Swiss-Prot record:
Chain's role: Catalyzes the attachment of L-aspartate to tRNA(Asp) in a two-step reaction: L-aspartate is first activated by ATP to form Asp-AMP and then transferred to the acceptor end of tRNA(Asp).
EC top class, as a word: ligase
Example GO molecular function: nucleic acid binding
Segments of this protein annotated with the region Aspartate: 198-201
Similarity-based family: Belongs to the class-II aminoacyl-tRNA synthetase family. Type 1 subfamily.
Gene it is expressed from: aspS
Protein name, per record: Aspartate--tRNA ligase
InterPro entries: Aa-tRNA-synt_II, aa-tRNA-synth_II, aa-tRNA-synth_II/BPL/LPL, Asp-tRNA-ligase_1, Asp-tRNA-ligase_1_N, Asp/Asn-tRNA-synth_IIb, AspRS_core, GAD-like_sf
Location in or out of the cell: Cytoplasm
UniProt binding sites for L-aspartate: 174, 220, 443, 484
GO biological process terms on file: aspartyl-tRNA aminoacylation
PROSITE patterns linked: AA_TRNA_LIGASE_II (PS50862)
Length: 582
């Protein structure tokens, strides 16, 4: 029989019609001789009623065999329910079954197919095809499909060209670890799976495509966390002849369209802009969450003359004020915050509370001489808690930024209904890597430096600024972009600043440098993490919830057991040997 419609879409207007439905048995109940079945498909659940007085003995016998997750086909008459169920979209109607066929049986599932099921993440991933049957998971992927549909329509309307770039590319430095693919034909050589289509999309601009986009898989072999996976999807854009502002306008329009069509939210345009320095100094993060206050306060000058060397001799002293919540934090609670602070390089955490109009706490006695000035600067009031970090500016910012976010979550200070977008601009071109002992690209080595700072490529690299911009949503980096280098001489200077010899630069990027000899236009672009964007729109805490078949925290798949061993024959074809490092 041909299915008439989805079970979850049957409504009162269908009363009096005969329809055919197909789906899974979500629940079976026997009551007063009647059998009630909740039939589930991707659109929802509908109640079926099987009355032994109105169906054949064969239908009744089949109904009595039904168990959870059996796949069935039913035909019946749509009726109004005697008692409506306002928890279901189909709660005003039910189907009086006249015909029933079991299409497939099912074993008892390892967990119940319902929302808010309590089961380990690895069990969910081991049986991902069952986990994806849960209504909230289905809704996440419907949302994801709507987002990608909206993005494609928007970019198509703006005459962007959708172009597929290679999955087998060249391994290049200056990024995360590559996933490598050995070549059978060129033995001893390897492809890399792309961390992004960065260079190829720039070459498309040199080819005259003018506006490119792609919703593309990318791969990075890095440590995992809640908003990272080894393979991920990004919305990749590149344009020719547009300014930084023009590119941002296009992206803002795209996001506004997605928010309207998927969440029915009108976002205010243009998005706020914040410099990198303001973000770090006021929020302690290059991806600030602006849904709440608790800004970092610089007290370095204020405490300079006090008789407390931890403060007076520190390169930087900064603080955050937890307004009106000092009584929520015991000494034990603050000790936990101190241990948390040490994870970010801080040596400790100093604190005072405002109690009966005065400062109280371990360091209060050292602040007596500046108490009035301090109270005024921090706008202190009764029951405030002040947390101080005295260290380098970088450690103070990073530590207090992390504390700010943790405390806001702990105290439920964040309005979860808000979607606060902003641009972080005016980035440094380089960042110092303690591990590498050198400066590395803050974004990538193809970013265009500002005209005012480009001369420092041969001087103080810390002073070079980039024409780069990150888009941030609620404390998450949604994506980043920049104007790109299109002049060969500038690109060679950039490689040299990063420590490449001329031969090394030519070996790694010679094809790009050669392309710059052939009229490379000014260009720029951006990439947005689609998984992360959908995660935030779905109000989930982990991108695994919006990726159909993700990896676990060990970058493995409990369902397929990937990664797996391969045969000796396969290794021999690739001229590879596995060495043990026990």
């Amino acid at each position: 029989m041909k299915r008439s419609m989805y079970a979850g879409r049957v409504r009162e207007e269908h009363i009096g019609t005969t329809i055919t439905l197909k789906g899974w048995v979500s629940r079976r109940r026997d009551l007063g001789g009647l059998i009630f079945i909740d039939l589930r498909d991707r659109e929802g659940v509908m109640q079926l009623v099987i009355n032994p007085e109105e169906v054949s003995s064969d239908v009744m016998a089949t109904a009595e065999r039904l168990r959870s997750e059996y796949v069935i086909e039913v035909e019946g008459f749509v009726e109004a329910r005697q008692q409506a169920n306002d928890k279901l979209a189909t709660g005003m109607v039910e189907l009086k079954v006249s015909a029933l066929t079991i299409l497939n049986t099912a074993k008892t599932t390892p967990f119940e197919i319902k929302d808010d099921v309590e089961v380990s993440d690895d069990t969910r991933l081991r049986y991902r095809y069952l986990d994806l049957r849960r209504p909230e998971m289905l809704e996440n992927f419907k949302l994801r499909a709507k987002v990608t549909h909206s993005i494609r329509n928007y970019l198509d309307d703006l005459e962007f060209i959708d172009v597929e770039t290679p999955m087998l590319t060249k391994s290049t430095p200056e990024g995360a670890r590559d996933y490598l693919v050995p070549s059978r034909v060129s033995q001893g050589h390897f492809y890399a799976l792309p961390q992004s289509p960065q260079i190829t999309k720039q070459l498309l601009m040199n080819a005259g495509f003018d506006r490119y986009y792609q919703i593309v898989k990318c791969f990075r072999d890095e440590d995992l966390r809640g908003d990272r996976q080894p393979e991920f999807t990004q919305v990749d854009l590149e344009t020719s002849f547009l300014s930084e502002q023009e590119i941002q306008d296009i992206v803002e329009g795209m996001i506004a369209k997605v928010m309207k069509e998927t969440k029915e939210i009108d976002v205010t345009l243009p998005f706020p802009r914040m410099s990198y320095d303001v973000a770090m100094n006021s929020y302690g993060s290059d991806k600030p969450d602006t849904r709440f206050e608790m800004l970092l306060q610089d007290l370095t000058v204020t405490v300079k003359g006090i008789d407390f060397k931890v403060f007076s001799e520190a390169p930087a002293v900064k603080a955050i004020v937890v307004k009106g919540n000092a009584d929520r934090y015991s000494r034990k609670d603050i000790d936990k915050l101190t241990e948390f602070a040490k994870q970010f390089g801080a040596k400790g955490l100093a604190w005072v509370k405002v109690t009966d109009g005065q400062l109280a706490g371990p360091v209060a006695k050292f602040l007596t001489a500046i108490e009035t000035e301090l109270s005024s600067q921090l706008k202190l009031a009764e029951n405030d808690l002040v947390l101080f970090v005295a260290d380098t500016l970088e450690v103070a910012n990073n530590t207090l930024g992390a504390l700010r976010n943790r405390i806001a979550r702990d105290l439920d200070m964040i309005d979860q209904s808000q979607f606060n977008f902003l641009w972080v601009v005016d980035w440094p071109m380089f960042e110092w890597s303690e591990e590498e002992g050198r400066y590395m690209s803050a974004h990538h080595p193809f970013t265009l430096p500002t005209p005012e700072s480009a001369h420092e490529l041969e001087g103080d690299l810390a002073k070079v600024r980039a024409i780069a911009y990150d888009i941030v949503l609620n404390g998450y980096e949604l994506g980043g972009g920049s104007l790109r280098i299109n002049q060969k001489e500038m690109q060679e200077r950039m490689f040299k600043a990063l420590g490449f010899t001329a031969d090394e630069a030519n070996d790694q990027f010679g094809f790009l440098l050669e392309a710059m000899d052939y009229g490379f236009p000014p260009h720029g672009g951006l990439a947005i993490g689609l998984d992360r964007f959908v995660m935030l729109l779905a109000e989930e805490d982990n991108i695994r919830e919006v990726i159909a078949f993700p990896k676990n925290n060990k970058a493995s798949d409990p369902m397929t057991q990937a990664p797996s061993l391969v045969s000796e024959n396969q290794l021999e074809e690739l001229s590879l040997q596995i060495e043990s490092h026990d």
